[in-house]
Amino acid sequence: QAVKQAIDQCAAVGFEMVIMTFGSGFQIENDSVSYLQRMKALNSYAADKGIAIGGYSLLASRGAKPKDAAISHHTGYPAKTREEGSRFGLSPCIASDWGSDYFKRLKNFFHTTGMNVFENDGSYPGDPCSSTVHSGHKGYLDSQWKQWNRISSFYQWCRAKGIYLNVPDWYFLMGSNKTPMGYVETNWSLPRSYQEIIERQNIYDGTWQKTPSMGFMFVPLTQYHGGGAAATIEPLNEHLDHYETRLRNLFGAGVQACYRGPRLYDTEQTRKLVTQWVAFYKQYRQILDSDIIHLRRPDGQDWDGIMHVNPQSKRKAFISVYNPLDIAIEKEIEVPLYYTGLTDKAIVKEQDKNGKEYSLARDYSISLKIRIPAKGYNWYIIE
């Protein structure tokens, strides 16, 4: 019922995906007929509402029996530390019989249930294995290649089946869709006001080598790690200003987050707020999903901002500017328009209204007067 409520709320506000993640009770390796049928019915319920659904599996750091573990080249025993060859503690060798069974169970789950989202938290991190009895590799020298090839083949299988992949590692060329934007998990236990700035810093720093849609962020609707009431958004209707800041931080950057909690809204006012920002993102989705030009990094001392650019779209640029201060900001900034494809003239529309023409300088820039309300946000379209 909790998952169905999440599906219903996603459909109501325009969200598109539900992930049953760690702590939810989801058991992707449970291959009992009754459990698989329950998950199949849940997938049908989600599909009827236009929602993609799937779940989580821990691979690295999950622990392992000695016969299945990645064996240290230095000690001859299961590796438990980085010095012994393990990136995240005691982990299985996925080129073992255990690994074969693991991927067989995952494929069976998706084939049987029809679910189409997989979050592989702790993908294969590159641990070598010195075992000479594992069925999938000969020894230490081929162990990394064999393990990497096995998980890469699985991700390619997922991609071919239309399964969306959240993978916290750089497996994009193997079929993965998203990796973390670059946050530190314990930051989401800090007071809410800290999280607002840190979130924008993560987005700013995480989009030099990624497009916005390649990196996922995190919003702790309920407590995550720690921090208590000061760090969480629940009750949602009591923290609407903060909730809106998080939504505009993310949707204004074209970045999707994992909203961790059982619900997206708790009152009609909260529902309208979330719906408003989802609709905003979808209206400008093409340009908001486009590459980012970095204007000013967030530091909590002055304005910060980013600009999406896409020379192939009608909207050549989308500027998002934020004000962390208790007073309004009004100033001239230089906006570099080279990557918009514009060469002579640009039309700037504050919040998509009342276009004003600007002539580009020789370096393809314009000088733009921005206005941002206290603790607020503003945006500009360039055509």
Where are the language model's segments positioned?
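Structural preference for beta-strand elements that scaffold enzyme active sites
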Residues: M17, G50-G54, N116-V117, G162-N166
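Conserved structural scaffold segments of CAZyme catalytic domains across common CAZy folds
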Residues: Q1-A69, S100, A257-D302, N310-A317, ...
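C-terminal beta-strand-rich structural cap/linker in extracellular carbohydrate-active enzymes
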Residues: S359-E383
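Active-site-proximal substrate-binding groove within the catalytic cores of carbohydrate-active enzymes
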Residues: I151-G355, K369-R371
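The substrate-binding groove and active-site-proximal loops of carbohydrate-active enzymes
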Residues: Q1, T21-L36, E84-F103, S135-Q147, ...
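Active-site groove signature of glycoside hydrolases
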Residues: E16-G23, F103-G136
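Alpha-helix-loop-beta-strand connector modules within alpha/beta enzyme cores
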Residues: M39-I51, S143-I163
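Active-site-adjacent "subsite" loops/lids of carbohydrate-active enzymes
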Residues: Q37-S44, D48, A52-M115, Y124, ...
